[in-house]
From Swiss-Prot:
Crosslinked positions (Glycyl lysine isopeptide (Lys-Gly) (interchain with G-Cter in SUMO2)): 13
Gene: SAP18
Positions carrying N-acetylalanine: 2
Family the entry assigns: Belongs to the SAP18 family.
The protein's name: Histone deacetylase complex subunit SAP18
Start-end of Basic and acidic residues biased regions: 7-20
Top-level taxonomy: Eukaryota, Metazoa, Chordata, Craniata, Vertebrata
Recorded coiled-coil stretches: none
One Pfam match: SAP18
UniProt KW Nucleus keyword: yes
Tissue-specific expression: Ubiquitous.
Functional description taken from the UniProt entry: Component of the SIN3-repressing complex. Enhances the ability of SIN3-HDAC1-mediated transcriptional repression. When tethered to the promoter, it can direct the formation of a repressive complex to core histone proteins. Auxiliary component of the splicing-dependent multiprotein exon junction complex (EJC) deposited at splice junction on mRNAs. The EJC is a dynamic structure consisting of core proteins and several peripheral nuclear and cytoplasmic associated factors that join the complex only transiently either during EJC assembly or during subsequent mRNA metabolism.
Amino acid sequence: MAVESRVTQEEIKKEPEKPIDREKTCPLLLRVFTTNNGRHHRMDEFSRGNVPSSELQIYTWMDATLKELTSLVKEVYPEARKKGTHFNFAIVFTDVKRPGYRVKEIGSTMSGRKGTDDSMTLQSQKFQIGDYLDIAITPPNRAPPPSGRMRPY
């Protein structure tokens, strides 16, 4: 006699993020690379042990939100504090199938405006210690380049 399992989508629950006690948990070193032209760095800029020169080193936790990271970047770059400045976040990680790196856009924030991605965390986007964060900063007087996530098809 065969037994058939029927699992519905409702029964497959996402594991909730466990809250991180920042008093007891050691922070991680987040290596952040920024551009101010609205485009992410090319992947070849991360090849052979090299990284772009625009590096920020931030000590933070896996539950850091994009809004929190935006605030930290604005502390370092006063020109990014202008209302309407757009921050597009991407994780740069080692490609396990071939030599080099891959990029995964994860969300965006805007200075002076609340957005749907503000509360997104590194942990929720499968960030792993050792990955890089690439932030494309677009000044308020220029429209950000279209991202793959916003395509109508």
